[in-house]
């Protein structure tokens, strides 16, 4: 059984930009391949604005609200019912994980190299590396930010992150949706 949660987060940079997140909680982990020479590398480098109040949703370009709240399985619903925001690790100065860190009102710097992209979040001074060379994660690559691989396609950076450690507030630290080692986050970064 798998639960699919689709999410969209809007982020403003020098141009209008967006991040699309798709979360797949399943036992299988799909793999991304190394960057193809056929895809042009877009210039996404710079400071991106997280935007206050942005949230992932169950669909594209839809405001956050009860009618489009991410679909949760029975276990996640039970967990959410006992959740209180004061339980969030952020109140103990613990770093936020993706995707929760994406929609906090802080900036993110994106730096591009031929074999990797660095995402540096202003909040908690978190660093995240997106590998573009198709490498596989090892058994020790589990972390709060997970292990990210990506490639460029149609003027966008597509990122897939796996290997998260359990985080009590990993998906959404305001609504009590945890993440786990089975979490898969797919992101799309582009500028209009």
Predicted regions: what they are:
Residues 1-13:
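N-terminal secretory signal peptides that target proteins for export/translocation
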Residues 2-3, 28-192:
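Hydrophobic small-molecule pocket/channel-lining residues, especially in calycin-type beta-barrels
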Residues 14-28:
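Bacterial N-terminal signal peptides
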């Amino acid at each position: 059984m798998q639960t699919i949660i689709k999410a969209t987060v809007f982020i403003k940079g020098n141009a209008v930009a967006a991040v699309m997140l798709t979360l797949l909680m399943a036992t299988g982990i799909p793999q991304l391949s190394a960057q193809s020479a056929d895809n042009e590398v877009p210039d996404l480098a710079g400071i991106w604005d997280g935007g206050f109040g942005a949230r992932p949703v169950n669909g594209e370009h839809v405001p956050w609200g009860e009618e489009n709240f991410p679909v949760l399985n029975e276990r996640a619903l039970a967990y959410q019912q006992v959740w209180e925001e004061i339980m969030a690790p952020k109140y103990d100065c613990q770093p936020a994980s993706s995707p929760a860190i994406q929609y906090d009102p802080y900036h993110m710097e994106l730096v591009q190299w031929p074999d990797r992209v660095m995402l540096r979040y202003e909040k908690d001074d978190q660093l995240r590396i997106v590998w573009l060379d198709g490498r596989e994660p090892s058994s020790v690559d589990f972390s709060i930010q997970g292990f990210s691989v990506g490639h460029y396609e149609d003027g966008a950076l597509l990122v897939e992150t796996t290997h998260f450690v359990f985080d009590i507030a990993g998906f959404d630290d305001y609504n009590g949706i945890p993440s786990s080692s089975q979490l898969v986050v797919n992101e799309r970064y582009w500028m209009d």
